[in-house]
Amino acid sequence: MAEKKKVKEGKGRKGKGKKDRKGKKAEGSDQGAAASPKLKEIKTQSVQEGKKLVLKCQAVSEQPSLKFRWFKGEKEIGAKNKPDSKPEHIKIRGKKKSSELQISKASSADNGEYKCMVSNQLGNDTVTVNVTIVPKPTYNHLLLMKIYLKVTSVEKSVEPSTLNLLESQKEVIFATTKRGDTTAGPGHLIKCSDKEKTYCVNGGECYVLNGITSSNQFMCKCKPGFTGARCTETDPLRVVRSEKHLGIEFMEAEELYQKRVLTITGICIDLLVVGDMCVVDAYCKTKKQRKKLNDRLRQSLRERNKNITNKDNRPHNPKNPPPRKNVQLVNQYVSKNVISSEHVIERETETSFSTSHYTSTTHHSTTVTQTPSHSWSNGLSESMISEKSYSVIVTSSVENSRHTSPTGPRGRLNGIGGPRDCSYLRHARDTPDSYRDSPHSERYVSAMTTPARMSPVEFKTPISPKSPCLETSPPESSLAVSVPSVAVSPFIEEERPLLLVSPPRLREKRYDRKTPQKTPHKQHNSYHHNPGHDSSSLPPNPLRIVEDEEYETTQEYEPSLEPAKKLVNSRRQKRTKPNGHISNRLELDSDSSSESSTSESETEDERIGEETPFLSIQNPLAASLESASLYRHADSRTNPTSRFSTQEELQARLSSIANQALCDQKKRKMTCKTLFI
C-alpha cells in the first residue's frame, strides 16, 4: 500500500511539473510579446564583380508575425505595387526569424548601402550594411602570357616572381618578390602576422603592403605548381632560366614565324627558278627547231635552183635518147616534131645566109605572112612572156603559079636588106620541080637536094601598124617584089646570120613610137632600137594561121652587090581563133614596088597544108602565131660576099637541128613549127 502511494505522488508531481512549465512559457511569451523585435548586425560585404552575394537579416528573439523588408538607399526592393523595383538577378527568401537577399551576379550597379527592416504589432527594427563590388582585374598580354617582371635589386641574381592580384580600391597592383627586401607598387611588402599567415594555403607566404590598413588586402607568394590569390589553384611546373628568359616569349613566336616565312619564301624562289629554267629550255628548243627548218628550206631552195640551172644548161632531156648524128634528111620522112616554147626562149638559134644577086623578079622570095585576129594581147610584156612557140616554117615551091588569098590583103617582110631601108618580098611559085612529083609527097623536102637551090624561109610574125617595113595593100590585090635567094652555110662563124631567134628577154626592148613611113630610105633596122615597136603602143594583132606556101628556086644565085641586112625573128605567140578560117592578110611592098597578083584558090592551100604536116599547123582552131620583126644595120654581121657550102656540110648542119627538134617532141607534146635550115 505504501508503494502505490509513492507512485501516485510521483504522478501527481509530474502533473504539477507540466503545469508549472506551461505557466513559465506563458509568462515568457507574455514578456516577448510585450517587447519590440530586434535584428542582428550584418557585416560589410565585398564581392568581386560577377560573383554571388548573399545578405542575411536575422531577428534576435522569436516573435510571431514578423515582417521583413529590404531597401537600397531609400528605395524598397521587391515592392508589391512596383514590379519593376525588383531586378531579375535579385531574390528575397524569408523565414520566421530571418530574411536573405541573394544577388546571383554582382555588378557595379549593385554597389551601395542596403537596409533590412523587421516589424510586427509591437514595433520594428532596422539594420544597414555596405556592399562593395570589386571589378574584375584587367589582365594585359603580359599577364596572360605569364611574363615575369624583373625587379631592380642590390643582388645580381633575382628569382622569378609570380604575379598576384592585389585588390586595393579597384586597382590591380603587381607585386614581385626577391631574396631580401622587396619593393613593389605603392610601398614595401611586409610579411603578415602569425594570425594572418593562415590566409595563404599550400605553403604560400603571406605579405601585406605598407600603407594599406585594410586587413583584407593580402598577397600570397605561392610555391611552384600553385597559383591563385590564396594559392588554391594548381599550375603545371615550368622551368625558366632567368639568364636567358627576359620576359620576351614573343621572340620565340617571332622566330618561329620568321622560320615559316623563310621556308615559304624559299619554296616560292625555287618554283620561280624552275619555271625560268623551263622557259629557257623551251626557247632554246624552239630556236633550234626554227634554225633546222630554215636550213632545210634554204637547202631545198638551193637544190631546186641547182636543178633548174642544170636543166637549163643541158641541151637534151635525159629521159630522151641523145640525138643521132649524120642523119641524112634527103629522101627521108620528117616526123611531126614539137619544139617547146621554153627551149625556144632559152636557146638562141642563128642561121647564116649569104647574099646573092637579083636574078629574076619572079623568083627567090622570102615571104612573111600575117594573120590578123579579133583579140588583142593585153600588153607587150604579156605577149613576150607567153608560152607560145616561135617557129620558122620552111616551105618548098612546087607550083609556078602565083597565089594570093581572096579573103584579104597579105603582108610581106623582106629577108635581106638592100641599099634602101626596107626591101619588099614577093610571092613566087615558079619552079620546074613539082612538089607532087617527089617520091614522098607528104614529107619530102626537095629544097635540101642542092645547096644552090634552096627554099625560101617563111615566117609567121605579128605586124604592127608602126612597123617600118610593112605596108598594107587594098583587098583583092597584093604587091610583091622578088628578092634574091640566099645560100645556107652550116657554119655560123663563116656566115653572119640574117635570121635570129632570140630569147624573150632580149625582145623586151622598148622601141620608139615614130612611124617609118615618113623616112623610108633611112636605116631603122637596129636590134636594140626599132621605131616600129614601142612598149607603150598596143601589142600586135594576133596572126592568122598561115597557109602552105610553096617556093622554089630555079636559077643559080649570084653574089649581091648590096650589103645584106639582118633579119631578127622575134618570138611567135600562139593565138586561138574561134572560127578557124583564114581572114585578111597583109602584104609587104618593096622599094622596087612591082605588083603581082595570084589566082590560086584557098582550098588548094589547105590541101597542101594537110598533106605537109611539118609545114602546116596541125590544129588551126587552137593556135595562131605572132611575132615582131626586128632589123639590124647592114654592116653589123652580114658578109657582103656570097659563099657556097658543100652538100655534106649542109646536110650535117640540118641533121643536128632536126634531131634536136625530134628530142623535144616527147617532152613538150606540141606541134613542130620550126625547122632551121
UniProtKB/Swiss-Prot annotation:
Signal peptide range: none
Protein's gene: nrg1
Bias (Polar residues) ranges: 397-407
Superkingdom as given in the UniProt entry: Eukaryota
Residue ranges occupied by any Ig-like C2-type domain in the UniProt entry: 37-132
UniProt GO molecular function: chemorepellent activity; growth factor activity; protein tyrosine kinase activator activity
Tissue: Isoform alpha1 is expressed in brain and muscle. Isoform CRD is expressed in brain and spinal cord, but at very low level in muscle.
CDD domains assigned to the protein according to its UniProt record, in alphabetical order: EGF_CA
Keyword set, alphabetical order: Cell membrane, Disulfide bond, EGF-like domain, Glycoprotein, Growth factor, Immunoglobulin domain, Membrane, Secreted, Transmembrane, Transmembrane helix
Domain spans labelled EGF-like: 188-232
Positions of transmembrane segments: 261-280
Ranges of compositional bias, category Low complexity: 351-375, 591-600
Protein name: Pro-neuregulin-1, membrane-bound isoform
Gene3D superfamilies attached to this UniProt entry: Immunoglobulins, Laminin
PTM per Swiss-Prot/TrEMBL: Proteolytic cleavage close to the plasma membrane on the external face leads to the release of the soluble growth factor form. Extensive glycosylation precedes the proteolytic cleavage.
Topological domain ranges for the Cytoplasmic compartment: 281-677
Organism field: Xenopus laevis (African clawed frog)
